[in-house]
UniProtKB/Swiss-Prot annotation:
Keyword NAD in annotation: no
Major localization class: host cell
Protein name (database record): Protein X
Subunit structure: May form homodimer. May interact with host CEBPA, CFLAR, CREB1, DDB1, E4F1, HBXIP, HSPD1/HSP60, NFKBIA, POLR2E and SMAD4. Interacts with host SMC5-SMC6 complex and induces its degradation. Interacts with host TRPC4AP; leading to prevent ubiquitination of TRPC4AP. Interacts with host PLSCR1; this interaction promotes ubiquitination and degradation of HBx and impairs HBx-mediated cell proliferation.
InterPro entries membership: Transactivation_prot_X (IPR000236)
Species lineage: Viruses, Riboviria, Pararnavirae, Artverviricota, Revtraviricetes
Name of the gene: X
Family the UniProt entry places it in: Belongs to the orthohepadnavirus protein X family.
Amino acid sequence: MAARVCCQLDPARDVLCLRPVGAESRGRPVSGPFGALPSPSSSAVPADHGAHLSLRGLPVCAFSSAGPCALRFTSARRMETTVNAHQVLPKVLHKRTLGLSAMSTTDLEAYFKDCVFKDWEELGEEIRLKVFVLGGCRHNFFTSA
């Protein structure tokens, strides 16, 4: 299974934040074992995009303070191809989860610009919301009603 997530870099904490992105808005808040999720206006998802946050299809670790596991990280536009061809990002996120030294925020920004944003710019994408697929995690998945 995989989940659609929006990526946001938080330079204040030097962490990479992954936020769940729902495929459609149902007009009602979704809550889980960690409480209600923030409203779209306070999330990484622009309010005018129409996306909402949802627990559906997300692994338990997605809501951990240490961040989600990331064994596979792909562009939603190219589901069949891993964004990180050299398997760099999963190792970086795993090191951060363990509290080990990893890429700096500047290095991560450069990584995403080179590996992700460049592809979208070349494809002429107008929507700048970056949606990724996080998968390969061994944790259990939520299935919201």
